[in-house]
């Protein structure tokens, strides 16, 4: 039967020699060897201790932990773009097994989260049912690719035996505090004595019945401790999406203030939420990037996200209140002509109340069309409620409201107006700015819009036209209280202003960060429940390990309570709140049986992926998330300077900040508490590119099936109608997805692997073209013919000795492929293999190539095309799997040419090419050049007045 695919380039399987390598034969070979690998546990990597240890065997000291960013099990299944990274890591792992390393490589499933829940709601099927079906389908698809995973180590975040340990790690973080002196997390149990002795003071602003911890009552003591925890409840501004019925993290909100999923409006409002104190680790998260072998782009993205900056906090007095601002440019204080607070700033209402609450005589541009500051603040807050932080920062149109209050500039005593404006956020700095419009673009735009003074304090620009934001000497910057920075450069001026502020008790030097604490709760059903209950006083209590896992209850109605998408005043009502028998419990937490209420939020989808690499190490351990001996073996540091961590982590750059930042934070807490020996989760990170494809839309903008589009005279048609071509990502919604199942059926999995690896460098994106897949298949057919006769299936290799040319070609191929494998340059691995196959085919096509030339080739291609390599290895007479056969070694002597070709220039023009011994002297090269017939013809009757010889490169003769 002839199989077809959309391209029409299916190998012809209905005719030809009986033993040709066809799609059908490839399928048989692949299924056979995949079963062999399963039956023999070929890719099972042993641990030092525990269930996965092998008794009596000493583990190799040389080991490798390779990890993929684990997939989300979507109902749509995989398209050919998804396996790109998985194939690459499999190739790298297989190559390293041939180097004798103990290789850990497996794959799990990140199965909790909003997509599964939304899909389940749409189909009426429980998310567990759809998730398990999706995992099974993905395992089938990935299994067909011949990926060398250790199946014993696979995990799913939705498995209670997995999320038991997610909850356990949450509790370790909950029961820890950050010691700023030691710059590390410590158990809460070590904090209590320090509070009792007074060595650690009560939190700033804490209001209790006494001034010392020891004199507080039990409830107050618990509240004090909660103020220190690395996990805490915060009544803070969050992104509330009524249409989805849940709070969203910043990364889940689009720039125009809508939910990434569902495109619903998102509103900023204050709610009580779980937060993780990731900001405590800001410095370590930045500084330890220097320890990592990561792309510079990713390191830069993390540094920018954390946003460490040095400057000063400055205090401005305003009617008995102090407005504190953070600035990196205290040298520009003399140019501050107004202040702007975030609309949500805690002082706004108090400042309005302290003022006259009148707009009499005020510029109408300052009033937002209202009669009083109180009315204007209320109206303005309502107008910006749906704006995301990103939209507020990027908005070119500056808006704001005058609070009816002025503040005093501390360096010159000037009274300056105080506004609120949406371009100032509570999430960075102090939520208030001193506006210096002459030297800040956004302040300049605001001042221009509201008619505010613009005063130059840094020389070098033309402030009549635009803000000057470059460096320059300070001007107009002196007072009569001992501060004069005129003429100083930026750094000198900053230092003097900070010194003056400290002396006058008007400010202090400060390091600030953009990074905010991590919002760690979702009002959904399909996520990890919190291992926390609340008593009658509303105090949170961590559950003991014996009560883990806290399993999701089976409920009939798991839909979130959603609201009118525009109802900004709605409040979250999590689905778990409906399970009253589950939420209301009686527990003995060490002080007798009492009634408690469970937390009805769930953890965000990031939770499981923040630590899953550690469970891969010890997936069957029921006593710990990971035995530290196993962790030390696989990810422990190998020197004092080594951070430790997974040896190679491959995934998309879209996870450069959030997932990687969160996992680094969790790992550092575990390190501080002594649960792991590695300081970082991932030593080396590699971002693969993407496989992209053409998509087509009709006149309505609707996508049409790409495989049914025809090209005629440079135009594209679908069912006779001309359509538009666009290029980008591959996906089901774009109707241009190609399933790996189809390619495996029509060509074989090895062909798919070879094609994807050969398309281009792994870290770049590349276009998919089904019609080009046939080229990879033909390469494998040529490889097959070097070993197997297509006519009768006999082995065609000979015992002939290798010629010098054979040895040169072989050893250069070995050296090149080995180097490229190590550098993840798999596209050039394939190119070198093709070149060597072509050489052997040309040299021995009719007589049979020497076994000594072919066997190393089969070994070298085994990492990329493992099924055909296993089959050829077996047919060559070997009984064991090729998986652990040592990768061939090369000899240096065969890498050097005996002769090299050199161009000969005469008066600057190439007139001949000569072959000279590789070690020839300049005099010898000159003699060979002059003896060349081509050279002799061009210099006949002329004098050679100069000879220039560059060994190994060229000869230049100057003649007259």
Curated annotation (Swiss-Prot):
Location (main, coarse): cytoplasm
Keywords: Aminoacyl-tRNA synthetase, ATP-binding, Cytoplasm, Ligase, Nucleotide-binding, Protein biosynthesis
Record PROSITE patterns: AA_TRNA_LIGASE_I
Catalytic activity: tRNA(Leu) + L-leucine + ATP = L-leucyl-tRNA(Leu) + AMP + diphosphate
Signal peptide residues on this chain, from the entry's feature table: none
GO biological process: leucyl-tRNA aminoacylation
A GO cellular component entry from the record: cytosol
Subcellular location: Cytoplasm
Pfam families: Anticodon_1, tRNA-synt_1_2, tRNA-synt_1g
EC number: 6.1.1.4
The organism's place on the tree of life at top rank: Bacteria
Motif extent ('HIGH' region): 71-82
Positions occupied by motif 'KMSKS' region: 729-733
Keyword RNA-binding recorded: no
Enzyme class: ligase
Residue positions binding ATP: 732
Single GO MF descriptor: ATP binding
Gene3D superfamilies: HUPs, Isoleucyl-tRNA Synthetase, Domain 1
Family of this protein: Belongs to the class-I aminoacyl-tRNA synthetase family.
Protein name: Leucine--tRNA ligase
Organism: Corynebacterium diphtheriae (strain ATCC 700971 / NCTC 13129 / Biotype gravis)
